[in-house]
Curated annotation (Swiss-Prot):
Name of the molecule in the record: Putative conotoxin
Annotated signal sequence range: 1-25
Database matches in InterPro entries: Conotoxin_a-typ
Tissue: Expressed by the venom duct.
Stated family: Belongs to the conotoxin A superfamily.
GO cellular component: extracellular region
Propeptide residue interval(s): 26-47
Organism: Conus imperialis (Imperial cone)
Length: 59
C-alpha cells in the first residue's frame, strides 16, 4: 500500500468515527427532548410538593 492510499484510509476512518457519534447524538437528543417534555410537568409538581424551596435553610 502506498502512502497516499494509507492516508486515504486514515481519513476515511477518522471521518467515519466522527460522523457516527454526531448522528447518534442528534438522534438521541430528539428522543430525549420529547421524553423530557412529557415528564417535566410531573417532576415539577412532585418536586414542589416534596422538596423544600431552599434546602440550605433550617426550618
Amino acid at each position: 500500500m502506498g502512502m497516499r492510499m494509507m492516508f486515504t484510509v486514515f481519513l476515511l476512518v477518522v471521518l467515519a468515527t466522527t460522523v457516527v457519534p454526531i448522528t447518534l447524538a442528534s438522534a438521541t437528543d430528539g428522543r430525549n427532548a420529547a421524553a423530557n417534555a412529557r415528564v417535566s410537568p410531573v417532576i415539577s409538581k412532585s418536586s414542589k410538593k416534596w422538596c423544600h424551596p431552599n434546602p440550605y435553610t433550617v426550618g
